[in-house]
C-alpha cells in the first residue's frame, strides 16, 4: 500500500523526502506519483524557499536513472507548481481544448514557457500543441483549429493527432482504468496511440 502521507506535496515541502515513497506501480506498466491535499498550499509554502523554482527538478533528476520517460501532468494554472514543472522538463506538450476560452488562455501559458526558457531552463523545447476534446464535425471546432494554426503554427509544432471529445473517455477516471483497458479500439484510444508514435518520432 502507498503511504497516504506521501505524494508530490511531500516533494515540495520536504528536502529529505525518500524518492521511493509514494510511487504507485500500476498494472498497465506505469509508475504514478499522485498528488494529495498538501499540494494545494505549495505556492504559499514556497514563497520564502531558496531556489523555489528548482524543487521539482531536484526530485526529477534523482529519478531519471529509473525511467525512460517521466511525464509531469500540470493543472491549468500559472503558479509555482507549473513553473517548477517547466523548469524540470526537457520538452513541453501543450494540450488545448477546441474551444474559445482555452485557446485564449493559451497565450498566457506560452508566454510563461518562454519566460521559463529565458530565465530558468534554457534547454526546454516545445514538443507541440495538442488539440483535445475535439468535435471535428462542427464548424466551430474547425474555426478554433484554424485560429490555433494562424497564431502559433509558424513558431510551435501542432500535432497531426487530435483527441476527439468522448463521454466514454471521461468515464475512465471513475472506472480507474485507461481508455486502452476500457476499449482499445475506441477512437480516443486510437488517437492517443497515434500521438504516442508522433511524439516518439520527434526524438
Give the location of each predicted region.
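Single conserved hydrophobic/aromatic residue that forms the stacking wall/gate
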Residues: 1-12
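Conserved catalytic-core segment of NTP-binding enzymes
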Residues: 64-164
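C-terminal alpha-helix
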Residues: 194-203
Amino acid at each position: 500500500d502507498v503511504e497516504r502521507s506521501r505524494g508530490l506535496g511531500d516533494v515540495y515541502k520536504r528536502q529529505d523526502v525518500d524518492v521511493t515513497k509514494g510511487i504507485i506501480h500500476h498494472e498497465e506498466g506505469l509508475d504514478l506519483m499522485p498528488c494529495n491535499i498538501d499540494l494545494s498550499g505549495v505556492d504559499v509554502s514556497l514563497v520564502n524557499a531558496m531556489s523555489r523554482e528548482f524543487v521539482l527538478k531536484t526530485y526529477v533528476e534523482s529519478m531519471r536513472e529509473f525511467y525512460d520517460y517521466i511525464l509531469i501532468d500540470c493543472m491549468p494554472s500559472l503558479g509555482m507548481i507549473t513553473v517548477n514543472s517547466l523548469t524540470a522538463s526537457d520538452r513541453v506538450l501543450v494540450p488545448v481544448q477546441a474551444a474559445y476560452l482555452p485557446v485564449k488562455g493559451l497565450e498566457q501559458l506560452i508566454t510563461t514557457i518562454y519566460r521559463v526558457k529565458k530565465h530558468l531552463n534554457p534547454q526546454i523545447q516545445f514538443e507541440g500543441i495538442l488539440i483535445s476534446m475535439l468535435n471535428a464535425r462542427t464548424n466551430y471546432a474547425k474555426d478554433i483549429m484554424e485560429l490555433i494554426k494562424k497564431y502559433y503554427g509558424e513558431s510551435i509544432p501542432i500535432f497531426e493527432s487530435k483527441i476527439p471529445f468522448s463521454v466514454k473517455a471521461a468515464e475512465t477516471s471513475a472506472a480507474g482504468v485507461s481508455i486502452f483497458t476500457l476499449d482499445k479500439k475506441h477512437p480516443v484510444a486510437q488517437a492517443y496511440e497515434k500521438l504516442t508514435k508522433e511524439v516518439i518520432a520527434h526524438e
